[in-house]
Each structure stands twice: as structure tokens, then as C-alpha cells.
Amino acid sequence: MAALPRQGIIILTYVLAALELTCLFMQFSILPYLSRTLGLDSVSFGYLQTTFGVLQLLGGPVFGRFADQCGARAALSLSFLAASALYLLLVASCSPALPGVFLLFASRIPSALMHTLPAAQMVITDLTAPTERPAALGRLGLCFGIGIIFGSLLGGTLNTAYGIQCPAILAFVVTLLGAVLSFTCVPATTKEASVQSAPQGGTKASVFDLKAITRLLLLPRVLPVFLVKVISGLPSGLFLVMFSIISMDFFQLEAAQAGYLMSFFGILQMMIQGLVIGRLSTHFPEEALLRSSVLVFAVVGLGMALMSSVLHFCFLMPGLVFSLCTLNVVTDSMLTKAVSASDTGTMLGLSASVQPLTRTLGPTLGGLLYRSYGVPIFGHVQLMVNLLVLLVLWKKPLSQKGEKAR
């Protein structure tokens, strides 16, 4: 097959990311019903979610190094094959003749290698100029929004019409198709020849070289940005992890109403990350956008501390989505610019591990805060944490740190 042009590879990468995220949210939409069918209580379901988060957390940085060393084709193919294995085990767990609970927990194991979004980010980073990078990475938000909307919609509709196995079977077929497209259409590597030939003078580092991963994280231009990403986004991440419970208990929403709210969230994410951030990045420096996301986080936190109905939350949601999208896109762009082109995959793998970290801590820490203090505590924590981060960014700008590091 003839090699695709650069723009064709970028478009294919967006399509592959949208397919994988749609399948992922199809899985999320049926997982609570499947676990209930298999007799799992809420505690066991929490263990299932935590297992998924821990495996993604551990696998992210290692997968990033694999992508740097083996190339985009191998990384995307491996991610889709791992996803296919997960959905196949999920299909098997639906069968009454098989040990469903064991297979359901076993289906979490391949998730350690399911990192299509970081692999797609690496491809986009390698194929775009630094000035174009925020807008190009922002367009992946369209893929995420498509995944939320169509994945949730297809999962619920197919589950109701054809049974709980149907979404898992469809996801298995689609991810197999994604693996075939990755293997046949994506180039072996998207990095420049000079970057590929750089490590030939010495021994090739191992994919599991934790020292190299740690060294990358501790670079002077990397660690401050990474800490801002983790600390600023953690309070809202805890709220979103607990949102399914909050929507039932605090907002008193039915399942269908909660689905509409998530669709609204997905549409906002598509619009803001796909259309707004790219335009803002051409007019404002990245550090100004980062400060604005932290400031809006603080304002939204104040609103969350005072809200009493779902209508109030709907008014706050655009600000929340803007902050989340801007924080993720801008920090990813800054982190990839802070490392050499040969390390972008590892860096994006580290960055992608932030969300699994929140998913791992969220059920325990978020549940404790919610039971002890109620919904307003999430707003108070978000307000105080982001005001502190904003103060630090104001006193010690990241650009000054970068200049000193050079």
C-alpha cells in the first residue's frame, strides 16, 4: 500500500482515536449493568474500576517509551490489539456457561496497553510544527467528544435492543479494524530520520527503563508543568469520578437525564477543545492560557461550593470544560516542547497517566469527602487549590524557569 501523505496520516490518526474512544465509552456505559448482572456489589465494582485505573497508570509511561522506540505503527497496533483482547474477554464474561466474574476482572488486564490517545498525540506532535501543536492537539478533543456522545448512545441503545453482549461484540470488531488500519496505513515511525538515528551510537535503552522515565520527569522544564497539571486538575477530577453518584443522590437525576447531561458535556468538549482552544493559542501565549484555565477553575470551584441544583451545574459546566480542556491541551503542548523529539511518546505517556491516577484515588478519596462533607467540599477544595496554584504561577512564571534551565 502506498504511503499516506502527512495530512492523510494526521486525519487517519484522528479517525482511529475517535473509533477507540467510542468503543471505550460503549464499554463504560454497559459495565455497571454487566457487573450488576454478575452479582457484584458497589464495593466490588469499585475494585474493578480501581484495577482499571492502576493498570492504566502503570502502563502509560512504559507504553510511551515503547512508542518512542518502536514507532507509531507498532504503538497504535498494540493498543488496538490490547483493546480487542479486553472486549473479547468482556464478551466471554457475558456467557452464563463461563466464569463471568473472573473473566470480567481478567478483562481489565489488557488495559495496561490500551493507550491509543497518547499514541495519537505522539503522531500529531511528531507531524506538526510547535506553533501548530496546541490547535492540532486540541482537535483530538473532537474525537473525545465523539467518543462520549456516540459511545454512550450506542452502548445504551444496543444494550436495550439486542442485549448486553452486543456493544462488546461491536467494540471487539471495531478495534480489530483499528488494528488492521494501524498496521497497514500508519508509517513505521513518524519521527524525523535525524531523531531515529540519534541513539545508534550507544546501546538501545530498555522499554522498561524506569530511570530514563524518571530522568525525563525530573527535567527542570518538565516537572513544574507536570505538577501544575496534576495539582490543578485533581479536585475537578475527584468530582467527575463521583459524578455518577452525585447525579443520583444530589441532583436526583434519572439514568436518561444523566445521559443527556453527559452528552451536553461531550458537545461542550468538542466545541471548546476542537474550535476554541486552537484559535486562542494563535493569539495568546501558552502560559497565559494556562493561568486562565487555573483562574476559571477557581471561579467554577466557588460556584460548585454554592450550587444547589442541576441547573446551577449546567451554568458552571462551560467554565469547567474550558478549564479541563485548556489545562490538558496546553500542558501536553508545553511538555512535548520541553523534551527532545525522541522522547515525545514517553512524555505523553507520563502525561496520560494523570487521568488514571485520578481514577485510582478518586473512588476512595472522593467517596470519603462526599460522605463526610457533601458536594460543596469539592468546590471548596477546587477553589483553594487553584488559587494557590495561580499564586505560584504569578510569583514564579514557568517561562522564567525554562530560561534558567537552558
From Swiss-Prot:
GO terms for cellular component: apical plasma membrane; plasma membrane. Signal peptide: none annotated. Interacts with RNF167. The chain crosses the membrane at residues 8-28, 43-63, 85-105, 140-160, 168-188, 226-246, 258-278, 295-315, 316-336, 374-394. Expressed at high levels in fetal and adult kidney and liver, and extraembryonic membranes (yolk sac). Expressed at moderate levels in intestine, heart, lung and testis. May act as a transporter of organic cations based on a proton efflux antiport mechanism. May play a role in the transport of chloroquine and quinidine-related compounds in kidney. Plays a role in the regulation of lipid metabolism. Pfam families: MFS_1. Keywords: Cell membrane, Ion transport, Membrane, Symport, Transmembrane, Transmembrane helix, Transport. It comes from Mus musculus (Mouse). The keyword Transmembrane helix applies. This is Solute carrier family 22 member 18. Its main location: membrane. Disruption phenotype: Deficient mice show decreased hepatic triglyceride content under refeeding conditions following fasting. Gene3D superfamilies: MFS general substrate transporter like domains (1.20.1250.20). The keyword Transport applies. One of its GO terms (molecular function) is organic anion transmembrane transporter activity. SUPFAM superfamilies: MFS general substrate transporter. It is found in: Apical cell membrane. One of its GO terms (biological process) is monoatomic anion transport. It is a multi-pass membrane protein. Belongs to the major facilitator (TC 2.A.1) superfamily. Organic cation transporter (TC 2.A.1.19) family.
